A protein has these predicted regions:
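Glycine-rich anion-binding loop/nest that anchors nucleotide
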Residues: 1-7, 149-158, 179
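N-terminal beta1-alpha1 cap of cysteine-dependent amidohydrolase-like domains
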Residues: 1-86
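Short glycine-rich anion-binding loops that position phosphate/pyrophosphate groups of nucleotides
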Residues: 7, 87-91, 122
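Residues at alpha-helix caps and immediate loop-helix transition turns in enzyme cores, especially N-
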Residues: 14-15, 46-47, 98, 162-165
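Solvent-exposed alpha-helices and their adjacent loops that cap or buttress functional pockets
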Residues: 26-27, 75-77, 108-109, 144-146, ...
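Short, well-ordered alpha-helix to beta-strand connector turns
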Residues: 58, 79-80, 113, 148-149, ...
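Class I SAM-dependent methyltransferase SAM-binding "motif I" and its flanking Rossmann-like core
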Residues: 92-96, 100-163
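A conserved acidic, glycine/proline-rich C-terminal tail/linker
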Residues: 165-179
Length: 179
């Protein structure tokens, strides 16, 4: 699992270091890479950025949308070597995934050795808990997929309220620690 705190092709299609690193972790010469943009409400520009970067790399890119006519996701996920989850609203993303049983399919993919990765909400989702801004009023801790039995806080160094919020959550024993 590669959890990315922020950045990547969602911010800029010109810096592909993270994307190349992800591909280097796979032993296959031309892996299948699936982008799941659920957290961004399947933002079209985000998906275009994914293809702008990954279609130029040595891989077979594809994406899954849930808010249109949804394909047989099991047949797609089962063929993927790398699954990249985009950023956005973690709470909404996980609710959609659970409705479609994607959470179970991702666990099967993880257990068979697929590389799971993502940025922001796509980083949080793999952990037991994540500190998220899915609620507009404040940061909250939420239960996630629990593939990694820890807590994750993306943007810890990049957003001014993250660090003090994490420290308060630890101090008040809301969480034990945070990665």
């Amino acid at each position: 699992i590669i959890a990315i705190g922020g950045g990547g092709f969602g911010r800029s299609v010109h810096n592909t270091k993270i994307d190349k690193y992800i591909l280097e972790q796979c032993s296959l010469e031309r892996p299948n890479v699936c982008f799941i943009p659920t957290a961004s409400a399947e933002d079209k520009a985000y998906t275009v950025n994914f293809y702008s970067v990954y279609s130029k790399l040595n891989c077979n890119p594809i994406h899954i949308n849930f808010f249109q006519r949804t394909p047989r996701i099991d047949s797609i996920i089962n063929k993927q070597n790398i699954i990249f989850v985009g950023g956005g609203n973690t709470k909404s993303m996980l609710a959609v995934w659970r409705e479609w049983n994607l959470d179970k399919l991702l666990l099967k993919a993880y257990n068979r050795g697929a590389i799971l990765c993502g940025v922001s909400a796509g980083a949080i989702c793999w952990f037991k808990q994540g500190i998220t801004d899915s609620w507009a009023s404040n940061l909250n801790v939420m239960d996630c997929l629990d593939f990694i039995p820890e807590c994750c806080c993306p943007h810890y160094d990049g957003e001014i309220d993250r660090r003090p919020s994490v420290h308060d959550m630890i101090k008040n024993k809301i969480i034990n620690s945070c990665d």
